[in-house]
Amino acid sequence: MKKDALIVAAALSAALGLVGGALAGRNLAKGHGPARSHADSRTSLVPRFAPHLGDLVTALHAPPGKPAPPPKPAAKSQPRPALHLRGTTMSIYEHTAHPWVLAEQGCSAAQRHENGVVVLDFGKPAHKHHGYGTILFSGRFAPNHKITTAMVGYSRGYVRCLPKGSTASITLARGTSNYHPSVPSAYTAGVRWARATNKLGRILAQEGLAEHVEAAAADDAEPAWDPSFHKTKQFFHGFRAAVHGHTLYDYGSLDGGIGAVWSAKQAWYVAGGIRHTKALPEIYNSAMAQEWAELAAIAHGRYHRDVRFAGVMTQGSASCRCGLRPHAAHRILAHALHARGVGHTVLPRGGTNIIG
């Protein structure tokens, strides 16, 4: 009887040792193991490849004389599901051209899983110290080369903070406007803007960032800021002459519709009428959607071409009710296009919401 008791005690001691080892492994993994995702921690605190405690308990209760069931093989790791990519990006009115500030902006965009067109608006064209650049929204002058460096910072931050294996990508557009450009030549300003965009594209390729970031340019072209259309046309013409395949987005307005300030030909010119241009129209209310639908109908009927939309632009934040939200803006523009008989016009889902 004593001998049998010793045998049972030994078996029980060995089983408890196995349980203790598993628990020790769990505590070790929590304290010093590699960092894991929040999703993993919700699933189990036991290391993925450790024996499951349930298997050990089963072994303790196995009938005498029968071998303990073999441990279950470790489950094959499943491929991580693709993260949901946001169809609406955040664009920014920039107050600085410090690359470390824009790197944080890029990292935040990656953490939001943004995917699409991002416009960094650096303000109106300007000229100072024999160089072209812009007046930032802080009122300071930023030369073109510093704007390029800032955009490289944004790109690095975005790529660095993307989850491993992410397929997200953005088109990063160097934004300006036609608001009273303080430059000797609007045409030269357009040429320099294109060359800076080309340079950003080369840097992205050289640094291995081009898989996730594409270089582009953008212009907030608004009729009220240039009623004669002269400087706006010269800027776009200069850009077209020097660009190497990069897109120039028009993220402006039509200010009352066709004929109120600009003619149909002028509005069409900057919204897809010339090479390398696309429209990313401001749709802050339903009236703006109607104006862009009118242009699309005229372009289709008169020029036998469709406006090349790249989505919509909205503005504001949670603390500012500044018009339509992105999904509502897209829906209202789509309805306006359909009502005008040009519902076939391609209107990509999503767009961008600008803050600053």
Label each region the model flagged.
Residues L45-G65, P71-G356:
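Glycan-processing catalytic domains of CAZymes
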Residues V19-F49, L53:
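C-terminal region of N-terminal signal peptides and the immediate post-cleavage residues
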Residues M1-L12:
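N-terminal export and membrane-targeting signals
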Residues K3-D4, L28-G31, P67, P73, ...:
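N-terminal cationic leader/targeting segments used for protein routing and processing
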Residues A10-G21:
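Core hydrophobic alpha-helical transmembrane segments of single-pass membrane proteins
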